[in-house]
Amino acid sequence: MDDDQQFCLRWNNHQSTLISVFDTLLENETLVDCTLAAEGKFLKAHKVVLSACSPYFATLLQEQYDKHPIFILKDVKYQELRAMMDYMYRGEVNISQDQLAALLKAAESLQIKGLSDNRTGGGVAPKPESSGHHRGGKLSGAYTLEQTKRARLATGGAMDTSGDVSGSREGSSSPSRRRRKVRRRSMENDAHDNSNSSVLQAAASNQSILQQTGAGLAVSALVTTQLSSGPAAGTSSQASSTQQQQPLTSTNVTKKTESAKLTSSTAAPASGASASAAVQQAHLHQQQAQTTSDAINTENVQAQSQGGAQGVQGDDEDIDEGSAVGGPNSATGPNPASASASAVHAGVVVKQLASVVDKSSSNHKHKIKDNSVSSVGSEMVIEPKAEYDDDAHDENVEDLTLDEEDMTMEELDQTAGTSQGGEGSSQTYATWQHDRSQDELGLMAQDAQQRDPQDGYWTILETVPYSIASAAPNQTLTTATTLSNGGSSLLTGATVVVELPPDDLGNPVGNIQYTIPALTKNATTNTNTTSLLHKPQATTIQIVKQQHQQQHQQQHQHPQQQHQPQQQQHRQHLTIQQSQTHARQEYIKIDTSRLEDKMLLRDVMQYGATSIAMAPQSATTTVVSTHPVESGLLLADADEAERELELEAMKVDQHDEEHLLDDEGYVIEKIHGDGETVNQPQEKLYINGMSNIIHTATTMTLQPDDCKYACNVCGKTYKIKGSLKRHKNYECGVEPNLKCPHCPHKCKCVLAQVVNFVRHGPKNQLLCQCGRYYNTLSRLMLHQREECQDFKRFQCDFCLKWFKRRSHLNRHKKLHDAELFLEPLSKQKPKTTSGQNLSHDANTDDEVATTNPAATEDESNYPFTSEIKIENEFDEFI
């Protein structure tokens, strides 16, 4: 008996393990036996998976006898094919909303299970199977487009008897276990709202909502009764009911794709035999009743979420009420015209109800948080079919939208997105543009905040000079036109104003100003450095120019200047300050990305003269206006401005005024030929960036020179164009970044670094015998040849005496001509006798030098010892 006992071994996670193995095999491309091609790209797959997920591939692979066939998909994109492969192997795929329609179309053509209607019943739709074990919250279908908020779960009891009309999603997987707590909380709130209908009725604040909701429910129930009242009608009644169903399904809030497809699929065989038509008609009425009940459920949910439904407890009560209302009409038979009109009227009621719900959403925030049903046009997501009882009851659907469970209607309207827009959002945008155009001070702060913080502590602006066409209040800024006409009104220079941010305590620190020297000699106005009155929140740099005016200016601009057209793309800010001298200050902000302009402020702080002026405690009257700049009146490019300045500099005018700023920080003012200056000398306090020496600016006279090439960045002038190019390449805007390892000195070019390195190089390389050091070899040789008395490298072979120059040695050798038979002293043996005098000792005078005292020392102290030996051997050979 023991041998007959059998044990049952069950693999609990057999299905999930088997599915995960296919995914691993696909990633490793192991045991793949077919290839799918789309748009020139290939994807390998398994025949078993394709056959199981698509009847089309199953039929196609049965007809192919190749071991590794290749299928080329013509009208399918590679991205869609990749998404379908992920869906078949993993059971889920993430895709954007704009690609959803194309993916569903491609899946429909390939008959992918779970994404298409791949029935195998020919042209006749099979009878839908009942699925009592499914919960009402998970409505079946090939794919269900449903509201983001699962408000339909409140009427789950009424949908227990609804049939499963899909019958084709055997391979679709259940959703994952996520956001269970959020869904349970929403279900509890929904159940509480359904049980307390009297509280919802008392909370209704708008009587029109109740009337429209009741009318919508009555008409929808009437349409349901009319659609289900003629089961024994003929083919004509079936066609009329089909016509009634089409406008009704278009007005449903929850769009049932499967029901729409069944309606369209049953329209064709409706003209067949009477026997088959009767069977199809029974199926049709059952499906229509289910679709209509779905629409009524959605309307009930919307009405309950807004507190406007009276006596609505479920779908059964709604259907009974609809039957009672539509009783007289059902007795007389279905009328196609009246049914169609009722369907259209039901759609209108649904739309009106949705609009009223949107308008009254602010009065029911606490209920919208529970149900969170917005309107007909809210976001739609894909919900897969529920296959298991536990998953359908406990789990929520993973949607592709943001979690808006705890957001109110006003917060949803403010949320960015395409589905949240509309007339209200466009009106808000127009109002924002109108307010923004009139708030110039706020605009300046916004521009400063939106500036890229990676540009550093400073933000350099364009320094190309501009000109003023006229002195009228409605003036515009231009450059090219004035330069072409002679540049009579070109301003002399600009002032770069750096506004420092406030300290930690909020106290103003001040600003740094720098007056750019004049670029041309055709200027007619004076440039002074002033302090800004308005301090934005962020650190900014502006170009400030002050024009002296002989005539009186108005203190305020015309109010029409504040309402300029919104379509202008370029905008500049003009701040006008009235003073005793009637001077006008112009603050122009021009962003640029030129390297020269970005290096300008740093060069000013390091090498140029700057003035520091604290922000005033009490600001005077400041008028802010906006001047739009047309496309033809924009500032010229830097290179074009440079060429124009070169042409203008050729025309030297002796009666024009010019301001230059020298390297010491003094303001040099050029006066007219008649000796009268345009403005009185004004003392300014400057701080030199290099030495930090405070001195007072003075005025001097400067004669016209021949410097016609001016730098458009720093204002320095040169006579030769090559000098200007050298200045731009190596001096202007170039930071000395080559640091010497021996000293803190920095160089701008490699040549200067080499020269500085030689100064700190090893001293024993260029050391003379006398103990002096030289930087170069040429200077050392010149010293040894002309100056050094200790360096003698020429030696006589007979007397072993040293000479400084070769010519002295040759003249000394001539004295040995009479003693040719004498053996040189270097080859003779040392003699004990002394007193031998040579006949030529008396003739040597100053030519013969004494024996080198350092000859007995180590030869390592003489760097040219080897050279001396080579030259001596060469002389003997000659």
Curated annotation (Swiss-Prot):
GO BP field: axon guidance; axon midline choice point recognition; axonogenesis; dendrite morphogenesis; gonad development; larval lymph gland hemopoiesis; larval somatic muscle development; nurse cell apoptotic process
Limits of the BTB domain: 32-97
Tissues expressed in: By stage 11, isoform W, isoform X and isoform Y are expressed throughout the mesoderm, whereas isoform O is expressed in both mesoderm and ectoderm. From stage 15, expression of isoform O expands to all tissues, whereas expression of isoform W, isoform X and isoform Y becomes restricted during later stages; starting from stage 14 to 16, isoform W, isoform X and isoform Y are expressed in muscle. From stages 14 and 15, isoform W and isoform Y are expressed in the gut.
Compositionally skewed regions (Low complexity) per UniProt: 162-175, 228-251, 263-293, 329-340, 546-569
Domain of life: Eukaryota
The keyword ATP-binding is annotated on this UniProt entry: no
Region of interest (Disordered), residue spans: 115-200, 228-340, 542-583, 826-863
Primary subcellular site in the record, as a coarse category: nucleus
Zinc finger (C2H2-type): 709-731, 794-816
Pfam families cross-referenced by the UniProt entry: BTB
PANTHER family: BTB DOMAIN TRANSCRIPTION FACTOR, LONGITUDINALS LACKING PROTEIN, ISOFORMS F_I_K_T
Entry function: Putative transcription factor required for axon growth and guidance in the central and peripheral nervous systems. Repels CNS axons away from the midline by promoting the expression of the midline repellent sli and its receptor robo.
Protein name: Longitudinals lacking protein, isoforms N/O/W/X/Y
Organism: Drosophila melanogaster
